[in-house]
Curated annotation (Swiss-Prot):
One of its GO terms (biological process) is regulation of transcription by RNA polymerase II. One of its GO terms (molecular function) is DNA-binding transcription factor activity, RNA polymerase II-specific. It comes from the Eukaryota. It comes from Strongylocentrotus purpuratus. The keyword Transcription regulation applies. Belongs to the NRF1/Ewg family. InterPro entries: NRF1/Ewg (IPR039142), Nrf1_NLS/DNA-bd_dimer (IPR019525). GO terms for cellular component: nucleus. It holds the Pfam family Nrf1_activ_bdg. This is DNA-binding protein P3A2. Transcriptional regulator that interacts with specific sites in the control region of the cyIIIa actin gene. Also binds specifically to similar target sites located in the regulatory region of the SM50 gene.
Length: 459
């Protein structure tokens, strides 16, 4: 026995569906408008989208054909499981019917409870014909505004307008020969004949069948074949002034803008740190990480994610430390200004020497053994460290900087201030408030080159 109220009950009782204004209500949507103007298959898709939007479903049409195909497979599998559960739990005859009008086979698929499944499959011809007629009555009329423009094929995949940047390599290889027929007016492209080569064909691509990539290995590494095929299509449409046939959906642009904004927002304090700043990381009790600038001791930023520290400071592994010769001058005045000027001079010397300079007369070379540590201090003096377990030197953080030598390798440079004692010798002054310590230098030797003020001084 059949319940009478179930015969014509709409699928959504609160919002009864009325197809009289099916497509007009969605013309304000850029995606639906382009779909409706592309032909019968696009009209079918636009009508389905309008149905979902009228019922307030929080979904949008997937413009990428590859992703759309994966979504179709996933949802069909879910529908089959749902219809089987419905038939088992409720005990009613129920089927799921999907079709694509306009294609040669209609892509007619039906599955569910028997015998209703077999009945619907036998009605395939009637269903497709009635559906084509219903969509044709509501499809927008084609406009003749572009009658004087050059005729080129629309970029459609399975009847759906598709952006050229989202077409797969196989789709591009199949589409370009069709595009050439419209562009050149010839039945065959004439591959390999320079006389048949279109003027818009990229000069750096060979005039050969696009089904195979005949470029050299170097050219293949520089530009992918898919990107080269996209360039061919864009050049053709721009040459003939048919940019209007290159579909670009507003939703895709919004997604790209949102993705770029999220990428920038992930590093909100990146511009707060100068490129030469030396920072010290402190793990706070609440799980955040604070960045302390060594020069001032002030907190630059506090990050919730410890992985952002590497992105902000751009830390590099210290494989080799080379300190270039620097003429030390003793003068009264602003010590910070002198240190800054000295660092700039040292950077110029390092760049000119290509990173490997020769020692000159009056220079003393000190070689630090394996396990030596370089310690940055907040003042401008130098001191040796030997606590029995490790040896090292202290370098003032105010003059610590990294430059790139001529060979492209990073060079750690420092301005070493030598304090002259009353006894005529030169010693390393005591260091206070050391705020940063680098990692030990494994299997490497750090060389410190210092210019002595006179022949009777020592380091």
């Amino acid at each position: 026995m059949m319940i009478s109220e179930d015969i014509s009950e709409p699928s959504s009782p609160d919002t009864p569906f009325d197809d009289s204004d099916l497509l007009n209500s969605s013309m304000t949507d850029d995606v639906s408008a382009q779909l409706a103007a592309s032909g019968p298959i696009g009209v079918r898709a636009a009508a389905a989208i309008a149905t979902g939007k009228k019922r307030k479903r929080p979904h949008s049409f997937e413009t990428n054909p590859s992703i759309r195909r994966r979504q179709q497979t996933r949802l069909i599998r879910k529908l089959k499981a749902t219809i089987d559960e419905y038939a088992t739990r409720v005990g009613q005859q129920a089927v799921v019917l999907t079709c694509t009008p306009g294609k040669h086979d209609g892509n007619f698929k039906v599955f569910g409870a028997a015998p209703l499944e077999n009945i619907m499959r036998n009605l395939k011809g009637i269903v497709l014909q009635d559906l084509d007629n219903a969509l044709a009555q509501r499809a927008p009329q084609p406009s003749n505004e572009n009658s004087d423009l050059y005729e080129l094929p629309p970029l459609v995949i399975d009847g759906i307008p598709t952006s050229v940047n989202k077409m797969t390599q196989a789709q591009l290889r199949a589409f370009i020969p069709l595009m050439l027929k419209y562009s050149t007016g010839r039945g065959k492209p004439g591959w390999g004949k320079e006389s048949c080569r279109p003027v818009w064909w990229p000069s750096d691509l060979p005039w050969a069948n696009v089904r195979s990539d005949v470029r050299s290995e170097d050219e293949k590494r520089k530009v992918s074949w898919t990107h080269a095929l996209v360039t061919i299509v864009i050049n053709c449409y721009k040459h003939h002034g048919r940019d209007d046939l290159l579909p670009e959906f507003i939703e895709d642009k919004c997604k790209e803008i949102e993705a770029s904004q999220n990428q920038v927002a992930s590093l909100p304090t990146a511009t707060l740190l100068p490129s030469h700043a030396v920072v010290h990381t402190i793990n706070n009790p609440d799980g955040t990480v604070s960045l302390i600038q060594v020069d001032t001791g002030a907190t630059v930023a506090t990050l919730a994610d410890v992985t952002q520290v590497q992105q902000l400071t751009n830390l590099q592994t210290l494989q080799q430390v080379r300190l270039q010769p620097l003429q030390i001058q003793h003068a009264l005045g602003n010590q910070q200004a002198e240190a800054t000027q000295a660092v700039q001079t040292l950077a110029e010397v390092a760049a000119a020497q290509g990173g490997d300079g020769e020692l000159t007369e009056g220079q003393t070379v000190t070689t630090l053994p394996e396990g030596t540590q370089l310690v940055l201090a907040s003042d401008g003096s130098l001191q040796a460290i030997n606590d029995g377990t490790a040896q090292g030197i202290v370098i003032p953080a105010s003059v610590y900087q990294t430059v790139v030598a001529g060979d492209g390798q990073p060079i750690q440079i420092a301005n070493v201030n030598i304090a002259q004692q009353s006894g005529g010798g030169t010693t390393m002054a005591a260091i206070k408030n050391a705020v940063m310590q680098s990692q030990p230098i494994p299997s490497q030797v750090a060389t410190l080159v210092v210019n002595a003020a006179s022949h009777d001084q020592h380091t």
